């Protein structure tokens, strides 16, 4: 009984689409990361150019919303629909297994809305016995540029056609608008009269689409047996698409017999008659063509991309081609221009239009190199194609990784998404000479059109009347009538923004975090580091490197000081007023700012002593301030009046103000003016010149400073004075969002001060301070519904006990925006995003709403707290801290047992990141900053180290504290000239060689991963070069016996390699044994004090594909070819085999359950074997095997008490859980591994790692609640999974009782939740069980959606499940990853 939880989402971008989605005029970007849909908006930010003083404008991406989808996305297209909710366009999303979803943006809910979902999984379409299953077939989605219909090719030869209603469907063709975005698209405005008038005359459609229909491709043409690619074309009045296909399957091995067998045919569709017409067909095209790219005007037609050439076909069927390497002539007889000197490989390349009038296109190769594709235009046709690599002066010439998706955004920007590296937002511009030339050319075109004769104009009229006209509008495109489109070399590219990607994660290891210099000197008070850290190899080719993952924020400690009985701490930064105004000298400018650190020491129940320090560099010096809290009253809050240059201290009984030197300037007592009763302050909020204080009778005291800086009370209305409040918060609105809901203002006012009050009945009141005007009342805040508004909730049932509500900015400096953060008495954090929507038929009337953000982090239960005692009973004295600037981020800190930060970046939603450290109170005060070079976009922190090489394997050397890397780089592969069987290889005369890999073994020290200059340091470390055509297949740190006499054991680095020279040459392998030794370092580089010393080397027959330690005598288990051998290291450096087992095809995985001798052997084709190794005598025995012949990509043991499970990841993104149970009758006396469950995760697994599991806070509470010693029933192991797209998953065993609760909860959530895109999570996970004995694996990400539900629905579902809320929270905490307490 297991549960799969995705700790980190996919990071590699697979699809991208630029579309006005959030509004009709917005610039938005839809990004898909396998099964994660993200919506970004584009914002222009002023930035300083490197090496220049002037500012230049950059465009940044800001995440608006993201959705985890229950499906794998295979296609993405934009569709113009009638009367969309946002006024923008809709998006058609294609999924694996022939599903389509049409979604749009709903501004009322601030989320996507599913218009429709289309399933094409019917048996009558896929029941043919010789057709593969849908999940084994690719699909192609394309939408007509005018959004009249979409075509969806699925199941190889099925074509689904979905018509879309457009303005003028029932009118004459005079209302035709061109495909360039003119005409039809202008009628999408909801307020426009054109659409309304047409709706009155025509039909009002209930849906934006008409019924779809499915046709076999053979009905279009019987010869379409092997479709390759298709796309809708521009400049046609009727929906018209071009399809690339062949009558026989293309094959490189059968090239002499199947040369130039590809056809390109253009069909036009008649949607009413469900018929098609062939417009043109081109035969005998190169057989390596794989994609059709429709080209907009001025070029038009289609560009066909092959592995060695580019072919352009216009609307009349005229062809132009260019070969980009020397093989283009050998693989095809098609006529093409020769540019073989470029030596380009076009496999899986990306081509994107640059969007200008020249028709140039950007070509991105799999290496990341970029080139420009230019079309020579001769009148109204293309007369030639040329390809030009970007020169060095173009600024950016490569993105260093293959692009998986691209989209033209407009305004000189292109987005390139990648699965192998970071995705980039590129900007391009022209030099001044190019701009001037384009203007002259445009002017020439206009002049030519003005001087055109009547006969020429009549010819143009003929083209306009032609149904399939190839004449574009010259005045619209500004295209020159002839000549090359533009002079080459005038493009300048630069990167505006990046989306970080840590995929593919190729290998993973765990190592100890080495001590810092402060810790080595004995100052352990500075240590906040974890025991272990996870280091993974990530990226491909030149974007490769390492990534260090941490479960919590590991702060960089700058200094520390020991203070006894410290209770709270504050900081205050002041600027001397007279120096700020008149200070001009350098000396005065340096002394104008002073930063104080104020700590309080507990002296008694109601007494505190204030300790004051002044910051001097990285040191703290005591500062004497006799006026500062001389009565030792309890401090509630300390803040700074920025504009008044005062420090304000809120005590229980009074408010004290201090000047620059902390001399007392004012005392304001806290009492009730109506009754003259003395009151005490319990919380306070300070913002600039305003101070809001909540007293012990739940009344509000509001103070505001005058021009002199003195505080005076400001009386609000009677509703505020008589109200009872739980929490108060002041917020300075920098964006003008809250002022926009005031209908009396013509435009929003920025930097207005607002007061937020949470009443006892949990209504949120929003006041503007300057005129005490009530702008909005948010009802039912304690209901925690997904959407908060001024309307009362429909169902008023169970409520959450809220103790605090604040409004604060979250995000980076340029993207900080307000968020409402609610805190419950159990430390649950609920985050809402405020937004303003238009209400009513009259424009200008807006209402304020709050949209709930996803938060899957559960608070820890403090030690010593029982389940019946609320953990937040004393948290009023520990309020949330608003941090306006912490390392460039605006964040909120939560103290207490679950101490951490609420952080939001431009690429992430607000999320909670825990602060590392024990919960126990200590006398040490540490002064820290956020760790440098660290990303906070996810639930775990990520620190990347760029190496510029692909790292395939890595291991941690426990004896030296070094990381050993197996890297590779691309090299040319040449046939061996010394082969006696093939003497003809010596006469090979080619210059364009195939690509192979050259491997190195390198060392990296942990300190290099922590330093900011690690990129430079790594290349000074020791490396060991392997032979030609020799690849690193495995690296392991193994404790080997190094002496046969003394039986001494040492930790050695064992490396397995393979010599691969082609399919027809048998592969060989080699086993290397290294020891990391200490040497005399280079004086200029003291970090080079380690070296790899070769201890042993053993060449073997067959590739060494996997390694593992086995047994207790220091032996290594080696998978070599079709055998698995146990070898021991001899003193002469050879490795002697002592036991072996014959395998079948290709051993992909070898794992041992440490110290037991039990091992699993995974075959890439024949499944997994469970074997055992015995030492007396040396023997390997087969215990059981899998009879389903799984394609094993990764495998690992998973012990659960007395049961032994084996987790297997196959090549179809599935997880299989097998069990070895010889007592089960179905196991055939233990010879068969029993299949217990199957779970589809949607990602290709790269590694599975068995890790120990620690107790979570809820389990610690249960174990400590009873004084008797009880057995720990919690599981002791879990499996960490890495994937090719950068995601990180965790498989956890759960007890029977918890499984029943969570299984029932999963069924309830599947049936009751509204799932994005209308998908079914149960169908996506496709859980299969082995009869009645098997239990399906649970989906942890679906279970965590219970946390984000409203309080009423959570209680209802918990009641249906038959569990209490704290029990479900405890179960969710166990599967959340908190069991990795040592990380």
From Swiss-Prot:
InterPro entries registered for this protein in UniProt: Beta-prop_RSE1/DDB1/CPSF1_1st, Cleavage/polyA-sp_fac_asu_C, RSE1/DDB1/CFT1/CPSF1, WD40/YVTN_repeat-like_dom_sf
Coarse class of the protein's main subcellular location: nucleus
Biased composition range(s): Acidic residues: 448-467
GO molecular function, one term: RNA binding
UniProt keyword RNA-binding, yes or no: yes
Residues forming coiled coils: none
Region Disordered: start-end pairs: 441-482
Subcellular localization, as worded in the UniProt entry: Nucleus
Function: RNA-binding component of the cleavage and polyadenylation factor (CPF) complex, which plays a key role in polyadenylation-dependent pre-mRNA 3'-end formation and cooperates with cleavage factors including the CFIA complex and NAB4/CFIB. Involved in poly(A) site recognition. May be involved in coupling transcription termination and mRNA 3'-end formation.
Protein name: Protein cft1
Organism phylogeny: Eukaryota, Fungi, Dikarya, Ascomycota, Pezizomycotina
Gene designation: cft1
């Amino acid at each position: 009984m297991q549960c799969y939880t995705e700790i980190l989402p996919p990071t590699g971008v697979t699809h991208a689409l630029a579309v006005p989605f959030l509004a009709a005029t917005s610039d938005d970007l839809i990004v898909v990361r396998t099964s994660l849909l993200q919506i970004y908006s584009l914002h222009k930010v002023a930035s300083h150019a490197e090496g220049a003083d002037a500012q230049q404008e950059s465009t940044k991406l800001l995440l608006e919303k993201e959705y985890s989808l229950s499906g794998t996305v295979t296609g993405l297209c934009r569709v113009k629909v009638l009367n969309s909710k946002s006024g923008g366009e809709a998006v058609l999303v294609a999924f694996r297994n022939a599903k389509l979803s049409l979604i749009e943006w709903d501004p009322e809910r601030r989320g996507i809305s599913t218009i429709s979902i289309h399933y094409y999984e019917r048996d009558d379409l896929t029941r043919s016995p010789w057709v593969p299953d849908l999940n084994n077939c690719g699909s192609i989605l394309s939408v007509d540029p005018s959004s009249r219909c979409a075509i969806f090719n699925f199941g190889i030869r099925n074509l689904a056609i979905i018509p879309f209603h457009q303005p003028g469907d029932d009118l004459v063709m005079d209302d035709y608008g061109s495909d360039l975005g003119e005409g039809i698209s202008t009628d999408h405005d909801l307020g426009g009269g054109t659409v309304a008038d047409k709706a009155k005359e025509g039909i009002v459609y209930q849906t934006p689409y008409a019924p779809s229909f499915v046709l076999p491709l053979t009905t279009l043409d019987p010869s379409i047996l092997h479709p390759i690619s298709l796309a809708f074309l521009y400049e046609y009045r009727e929906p018209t698409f071009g399809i690339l296909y062949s009558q026989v399957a293309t094959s490189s091995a059968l090239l002499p017999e199947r040369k130039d067998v590809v056809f390109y045919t253009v069909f036009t569709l008649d949607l009413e008659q469900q018929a098609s017409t062939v417009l043109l067909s081109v035969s005998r095209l190169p057989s390596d063509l794989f994609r059709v790219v429709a080209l907009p005007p001025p070029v038009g037609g289609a560009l066909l991309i092959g592995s060695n050439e580019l072919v352009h076909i216009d609307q009349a069927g005229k062809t132009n081609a260019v070969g980009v390497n020397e093989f283009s002539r050998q693989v095809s007889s098609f006529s093409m221009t020769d540019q073989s000197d470029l030596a380009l490989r076009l496999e899986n390349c990306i081509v994107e239009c640059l969007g200008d009038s020249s028709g140039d296109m950007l070509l991105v190769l799999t290496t990341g190199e970029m080139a420009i594709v230019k079309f020579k235009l001769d009148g109204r046709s293309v007369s030639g194609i040329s390809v030009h690599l970007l020169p060095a002066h173009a600024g950016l010439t490569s993105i260093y990784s293959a692009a998986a998706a691209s989209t033209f955004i407009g305004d000189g920007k292109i987005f390139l998404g990648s699965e192998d590296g970071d995705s980039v937002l590129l900007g391009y511009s022209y030099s001044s000479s190019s701009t001037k030339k384009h203007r002259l050319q445009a002017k020439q075109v206009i002049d030519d059109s003005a001087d055109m004769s009547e006969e020429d104009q009549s010819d143009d009229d003929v083209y306009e009347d032609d149904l399939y006209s190839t004449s574009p509008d010259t005045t619209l495109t500004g295209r020159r009538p002839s000549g090359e489109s533009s002079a080459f070399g005038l493009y300048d590219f630069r990167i505006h923004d990046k989306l970080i990607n840590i995929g593919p994660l190729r290998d993973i290891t765990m190592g100890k975090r080495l001590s810092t210099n402060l810790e080595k000197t004995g100052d352990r008070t500075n240590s906040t580091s974890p025991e272990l850290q996870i280091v993974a190899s990530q990226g491909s080719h030149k974007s490769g490197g390492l990534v260090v993952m941490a479960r919590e924020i590991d702060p960089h400690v700058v200094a520390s000081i020991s203070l006894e009985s410290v209770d709270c701490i504050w900081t205050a930064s002041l600027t001397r007023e007279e120096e700020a105004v008149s200070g001009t000298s350098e000396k005065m400018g340096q002394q104008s700012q002073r930063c104080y650190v104020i700590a309080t020491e507990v002296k008694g129940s109601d007494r505190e002593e204030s300790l004051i320090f002044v910051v001097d560099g990285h040191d703290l010096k005591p500062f004497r301030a006799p006026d500062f809290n001389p009565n030792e009253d309890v401090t509630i809050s300390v803040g700074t009046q920025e504009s008044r240059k005062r420090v304000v201290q809120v005590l229980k009984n009074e408010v004290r103000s201090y000047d620059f030197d902390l001399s007392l300037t004012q005392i304001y007592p806290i009492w009730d003016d109506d009754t003259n009763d003395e009151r005490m302050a319990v919380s306070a909020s300070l913002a600039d010149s305003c101070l809001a204080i909540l007293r012990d009778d739940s009344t509000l005291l509001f103070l505001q400073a005058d021009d002199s800086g003195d505080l005076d009370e400001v009386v609000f209305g009677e509703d505020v004075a008589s109200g009872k409040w739980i929490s108060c918060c002041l917020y300075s609105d920098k964006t003008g969002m809250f002022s926009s809901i005031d209908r009396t203002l013509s435009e929003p006012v920025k930097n207005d001060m607002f007061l937020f009050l949470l009443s006892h009945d949990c209504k949120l009141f929003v006041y503007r301070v300057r005129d005490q005007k009530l702008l909005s009342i948010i009802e039912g805040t304690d209901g925690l519904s997904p959407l908060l508004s001024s309307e009362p909730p429909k169902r008023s049932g169970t409520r959450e006990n809220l103790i605090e509500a604040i409004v604060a900015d979250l995000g980076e400096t340029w993207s900080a925006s307000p968020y409402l953060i609610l805190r419950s008495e159990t430390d649950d954090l609920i985050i809402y995003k405020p937004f303003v929507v238009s209400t009513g038929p009259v424009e200008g009337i807006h209402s304020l709403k709050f949209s709930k953000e996803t938060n899957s982090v559960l608070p820890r239960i403090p030690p010593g707290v029982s389940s019946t005692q609320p953990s937040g009973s004393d948290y009023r004295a520990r309020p949330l801290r608003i941090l306006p600037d912490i390392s460039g981020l605006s964040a909120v800190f939560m103290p207490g047992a679950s101490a951490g930060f609420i952080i939001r970046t431009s690429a992430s939603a607000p999320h909670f990141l825990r602060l590392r450290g024990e919960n126990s109170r200590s006398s040490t005060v540490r002064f820290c900053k956020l760790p440098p070079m660290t990303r906070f976009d996810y639930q775990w922190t990520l620190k990347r180290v760029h190496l510029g090489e692909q790292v395939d394997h890595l291991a941690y050397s426990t004896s030296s504290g070094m990381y050993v890397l197996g890297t590779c780089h691309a090299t040319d592969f040449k046939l061996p000239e010394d082969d006696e069987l093939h003497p003809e290889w010596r006469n090979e005369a080619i210059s364009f060689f195939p690509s192979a890999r050259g491997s190195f073994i390198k060392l990296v020290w942990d300190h290099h991963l922590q330093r900011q200059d690690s990129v430079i340091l790594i290349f000074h470390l020791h490396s060991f070069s392997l032979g030609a055509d020799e690849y690193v297949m495995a690296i392991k740190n193994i404790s080997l016996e190094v002496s046969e006499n003394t039986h001494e054991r040492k930790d050695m680095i064992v490396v397995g390699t393979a010599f691969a020279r082609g399919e027809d040459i048998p592969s060989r392998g080699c086993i290397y044994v290294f020891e990391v030794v200490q040497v005399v370092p280079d004086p200029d580089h003291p970090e080079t004090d380690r070296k790899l010393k070769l201890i042993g080397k053993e060449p073997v027959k067959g590739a060494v594909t996997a390694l593992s330690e086995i047994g207790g005598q220091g032996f290594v288990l080696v998978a070599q070819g079709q055998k698995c051998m146990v070898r021991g290291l001899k003193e002469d450096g050879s490795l002697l085999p002592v036991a072996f087992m014959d395998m079948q095809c290709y051993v992909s995985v070898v794992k041992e359950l440490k110290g037991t001798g039990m091992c699993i052997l995974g075959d890439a084709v024949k499944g997994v074997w469970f074997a055992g190794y015995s030492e007396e005598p040396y023997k390997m025995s087969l215990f059981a095997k899998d009879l389903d012949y799984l394609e094993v990509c990764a495998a690992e043991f998973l012990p659960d008490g007395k049961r032994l499970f084996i987790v297997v990841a196959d090549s179809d993104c599935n997880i299989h859980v097998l069990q070895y149970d010889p007592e089960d009758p179905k196991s055939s006396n233990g010879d068969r591994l029993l299949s217990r469950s199957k779970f589809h995760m949607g990602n290709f697994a790269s590694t599975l790692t068995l890790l120990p599991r620690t107790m979570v806070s809820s389990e610690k509470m249960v174990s400590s609640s009873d004084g008797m010693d009880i057995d720990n029933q919690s599981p002791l192991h879990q499996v960490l999974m890495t994937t090719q797209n950068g995601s990180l998953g965790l498989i956890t065993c759960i007890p029977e009782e918890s499984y029943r609760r969570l299984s029932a909860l999963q069924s309830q959530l599947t049936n009751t939740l509204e799932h994005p895109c209308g998908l079914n999570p149960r169908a996506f996970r496709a859980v299969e069980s082995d009869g009645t004995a098997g239990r399906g694996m649970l989906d942890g990400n679906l279970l965590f959606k219970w946390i984000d539900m409203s309080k009423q629905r959570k209680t209802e579902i918990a009641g249906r499940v038959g569990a209490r809320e704290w029990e479900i929270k405890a179960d969710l905490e166990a599967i959340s990853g908190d069991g990795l307490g040592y990380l």
